[in-house]
């Protein structure tokens, strides 16, 4: 079994879906994971926002706009007279959620997951139908039934043992060897829909690869492979042919967009190679991530923009006590806020954290626990792994925008004003 994952940018239009068909034609023993098409997740987030605000008319309008977008793709692929009943049913389900739900803020994340999951349900239904009509017999899999997650919304973890049983049951006794399933989504023990975190389709594919013992996983992207930097920011960026699991985890943790941070562990557990391959050229080698690659590449430079800087001041001047640190980290963890860099003095603590819905709630709690908190949102984090003196001098030695700097033998990391 191989696992292929296709992102939303790759299947944003009919041409992309045709290219997917070209890539998978002739493959056997293949599990295909697909994201929502194009910017559909953003569109469905707009539906959710309108629902939060009690604006039913706008929510329904956004659904109709999404339907028109997907209908255009279907028309180009299959003809204007082709009806896919399951697509119409999915959109009608969305409309009924908006019309019939009594929204409560305490259920915000539940309804967020329920609504945005339709992006993947719709994309995979279109693609499964198209493949079946063009010589690639396949079975559509509802990953809400196949993936058992914890009872947590927006960033759920997957129960591997239970998921292995469920997924194998879903594909058992099939007369086909190709399967199409959704990335990003799963199901909680109570049957509600969960999501695995933004851009979580990579993680979904890695879970499938793990529980099915796949020989490899391939992520098809609109890049030549893994680059050592974002070429939009660092013009001298070059492709890395081979990378090990550990450095990939470091890159993902630091904000590299190439792979979702949770993706590597399920692959590493079973030593499954991960290929990052160019969607526009199926014959190109791309990059490969395995467990047996020695470091033999250039410095890796990553810029992460969705950062918030928190400056905490202890009112009783006792910040050095471990109890104070514990309070801060426990509060942030309870709100699922990821901390990236921490720097402390005797009574002040500086923290760079990922932007989150819950930051203001966490700040209120921290203030109640005896801290004065200042928040800055105009910051970014830069990481240079395997830096050298020339890079240190160029980026970190004299930049007055830098607020926090961390230097280790292998990594240079700093937070600066944009």
Question: What residue spans do the PLM features occupy?
Answer:
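A conserved active-site cap/scaffold subdomain adjacent to cofactor or substrate pockets
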Residues: 242-290, 295-297, 305-307
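Short, glycine-/Ser/Thr-/acidic-enriched flexible segments
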Residues: 8-9, 37-38, 185-186, 201, ...
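Nucleotide/pyrophosphate-binding catalytic subdomain
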Residues: 1-256, 264, 387, 417
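Residue-level "edge-of-site" marker
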Residues: 144, 222-223, 280, 345, ...
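Conserved dinucleotide-binding and phosphotransfer motif residues
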Residues: 134, 270, 335
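A conserved regulatory-domain signal marking ACT and ACT-like small-molecule sensing domains
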Residues: 285-418
């Amino acid at each position: 079994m191989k696992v292929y994952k296709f992102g939303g940018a790759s299947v944003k239009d009919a041409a992309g879906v045709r290219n997917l068909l070209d890539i998978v034609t002739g493959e056997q023993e293949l599990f295909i994971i697909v994201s929502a098409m194009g910017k559909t997740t953003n569109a469905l987030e707009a539906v959710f926002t309108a629902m939060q605000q009690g604006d039913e008319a706008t929510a329904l309008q956004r659904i109709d706009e999404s339907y028109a977008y997907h209908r255009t793709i279907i028309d180009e692929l299959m003809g204007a007279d082709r009806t896919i009943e399951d697509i119409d049913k999915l959109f009608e389900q969305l409309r009924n959620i908006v019309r019939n739900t009594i929204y409560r803020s305490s259920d915000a994340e539940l309804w967020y997951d329920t609504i945005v999951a339709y992006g993947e349900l719709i994309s995979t239904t279109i693609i499964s139908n198209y493949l079946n009509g063009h010589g690639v017999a396949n079975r559509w899999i509802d990953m809400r039934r196949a993936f058992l997650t914890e009872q947590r919304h927006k960033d759920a973890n997957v129960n591997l043992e239970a998921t292995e049983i469920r997924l194998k049951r879903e594909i058992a006794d099939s007369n086909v060897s190709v399967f199409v399933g959704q990335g990003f989504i799963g199901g909680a023990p109570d049957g509600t829909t969960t999501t695995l975190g933004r851009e979580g389709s990579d993680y979904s594919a890695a879970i499938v690869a793990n529980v099915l013992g796949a020989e490899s996983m391939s992520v098809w992207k609109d890049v030549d492979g893994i680059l050592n930097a974002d070429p939009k920011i660092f013009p001298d960026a070059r492709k890395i042919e081979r990378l090990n699991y550990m450095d990939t985890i470091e890159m993902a943790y630091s904000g590299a967009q190439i792979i979702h941070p949770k993706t590597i562990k399920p692959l590493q557990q079973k030593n499954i190679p991960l290929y990052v391959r160019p969607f526009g050229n199926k014959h190109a080698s791309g990059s490969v991530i395995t467990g047996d690659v020695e470091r033999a590449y250039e410095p890796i430079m990553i810029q992460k923009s969705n950062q918030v800087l928190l400056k905490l001041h202890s009112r009783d001047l006792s910040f050095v006590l471990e109890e104070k640190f514990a309070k801060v980290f426990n509060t942030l963890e309870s709100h699922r806020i990821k901390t990236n860099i921490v720097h402390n003095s005797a009574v002040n603590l500086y923290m760079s954290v990922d932007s989150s819905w819950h930051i203001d709630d966490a700040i209120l709690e921290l203030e109640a626990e005896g801290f004065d908190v200042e928040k800055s949102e105009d910051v970014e984090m830069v990481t240079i792994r395997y830096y050298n003196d020339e890079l240190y001098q160029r980026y970190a030695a004299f930049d007055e925008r830098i607020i926090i700097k961390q230097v280790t033998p292998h990594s240079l990391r700093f937070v600066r004003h944009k």
